Amino acid sequence: MLWALAGLRAVMLANQKLQLADLSRVESFYGELLRAFNHAASQEMVADPRGFSYLPMLMREDPAMQRDTWDRPRPQTSQWACSHSIFPGQVFSKDDPVVRGHIALMQASTQEDIPAETGWLHHEAVWNYNAPFVAEAYLWAGLRDWAHSTFRGYLNHASPLYAWREEQPLQKALLGMAWGDMPHNWASAECIRYLRHMLVLEDGQKLRLLEGILPPDLRTGQPFALIDTPTRFGRISFSLEPAAGRAWKAHFVRKEGDHPEAVEIRTNLLPGLTLRRVNGAGFHAGADGISTIDPAAREWRSIWEP
């Protein structure tokens, strides 16, 4: 149902622009299904002894939940669809109990910097490319440090040829098992998707820039760039590169498309390095470490300086 909700929401939002008569009933169906889901979810929430409540992906009546404790799916098993519905599906608000519970469960399940025991292998194993699903949910929720460490952990589980096995044992596993495809191309696609969202993240009608860039990413002084990446606001090209001294500069270009309601960017890129100028657009530095830039501006350049 979570995938269905995410898909219906996407169709509903698209039809608000397209106004296709055949799809006019999608909005009411989505609302009806979401209400039914929320009612069922409130009854299925589980209180975890670690101090949070979460929504399991298997209902209490599922035969798998009646197995011996060793063979029973873990609380974090199959939470991938919940990650997808949180982001990019954006079915829930950031303070929804489903979101809060999912994040707490994934954090509590983290081993070797990524969520563990989330797939077919229930004991001392990781489903590698589940990690970027969760990292993107963290990033959308504003948990930048968790997103960064989880994505870094995911990269550290790649093979020497920069590919990922679907599931593999933890380093401490007493009995190692491997499961699934090798390499798994979905894993490679998720790597690209997260890297894109580090620079350009669509949050509803808001555009969040550099959300996933943290100081360690800038230590080598290497530039970052996206060229014509598709967004709901038109194709965007965006680059970040070193400038004179310790400064960094960015260049933003947005082509045809409706402008977002807001464009946000980090005020402080590095300790002691602050957004000083935006040429080509008005900007306002907020007290929360976020600067807003005129969303109607299609091209601008910015610079962070001491």
In which residue ranges do the predicted regions lie?
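Non-catalytic C-terminal accessory modules of carbohydrate-active enzymes
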Residues: 145-306
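Active-site core of glycosidic bond-cleaving carbohydrate-active enzymes
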Residues: 1-2, 6-17, 24-35, 46-201
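Short, intrinsically disordered, low-complexity segments enriched in Ser/Thr and Pro
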Residues: 27-28, 32, 38, 260-267
